[in-house]
C-alpha cells in the first residue's frame, strides 16, 4: 500500500510539472524561467535573462474609473516588442498569467495581438514578423493599476 502511495505521489508530481511547464521547444521542453529560442529551425531552451534578442516594454496610456462597470478602475497599456537582432523575428509567443485581467473579452480590451485560448499572445496575421531592429506595439485594457506579467515564451528567427 505504501509503495502505491509513493508511486501515485510521484505520478502526480510528474503530472503537475508537465501541466505547469508544458511548453515544447523542438525536441526539448522548456522550464519556468526559460525561453524557447529557435534559430533557423534549431531549438534550445535558454534562461530568460539570456534572451537579449527581444525585449518587452510597458507604457501606461491612461487610468480611469468606469461608473458603468461598478466604479472599477481600469488602465490602458501599450506593450512594445523590440527586435534587437540583425534579422527578422518570424514568430514570438508571450506568456501571461492571472494578472492579465482584461476589461472584457472583446477587441475593445486587447488589440494588435492574438490572444490564444491558453492565454498566450502571438503576432496577428497582418504582422507576420518584426523586422531587424524594429518594434511592434499592441495594446490592452486591464482591471486595476498593476501591469500584467508578460514574459517571452518563445522567439523564432
Swiss-Prot record:
Residues 1-19 form the signal peptide. The keyword Transmembrane does not apply. Its main location: secreted. Keywords: Developmental protein, Differentiation, Secreted, Signal, Sporulation. GO terms for biological process: cell differentiation; extracellular matrix organization; sporulation resulting in formation of a cellular spore. The keyword Cell division does not apply. It is found in: Secreted. One of its GO terms (cellular component) is extracellular region. This is Stalk-specific protein B. It comes from Dictyostelium discoideum. The gene is staB.
Amino acid at each position: 500500500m505504501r509503495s502505491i502511495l509513493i508511486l501515485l505521489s510521484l505520478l502526480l508530481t510528474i503530472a503537475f510539472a508537465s501541466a505547469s511547464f508544458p511548453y515544447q521547444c523542438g525536441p526539448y521542453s522548456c522550464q519556468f524561467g526559460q525561453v524557447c529560442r529557435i534559430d533557423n529551425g534549431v531549438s534550445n531552451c535558454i534562461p530568460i535573462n539570456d534572451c537579449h534578442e527581444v525585449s518587452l516594454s510597458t507604457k501606461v496610456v491612461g487610468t480611469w474609473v468606469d461608473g458603468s462597470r461598478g466604479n472599477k478602475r481600469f488602465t490602458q497599456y501599450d506593450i512594445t516588442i523590440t527586435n534587437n537582432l540583425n534579422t527578422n523575428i518570424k514568430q514570438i509567443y508571450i506568456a501571461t498569467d492571472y494578472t492579465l485581467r482584461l476589461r472584457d473579452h472583446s477587441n475593445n480590451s486587447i488589440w494588435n495581438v492574438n490572444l490564444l485560448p491558453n492565454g498566450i499572445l502571438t503576432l496577428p496575421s497582418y504582422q507576420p514578423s518584426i523586422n531587424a531592429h524594429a518594434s511592434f506595439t499592441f495594446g490592452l485594457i486591464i482591471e486595476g493599476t498593476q501591469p500584467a506579467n508578460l514574459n517571452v515564451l518563445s522567439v523564432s528567427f
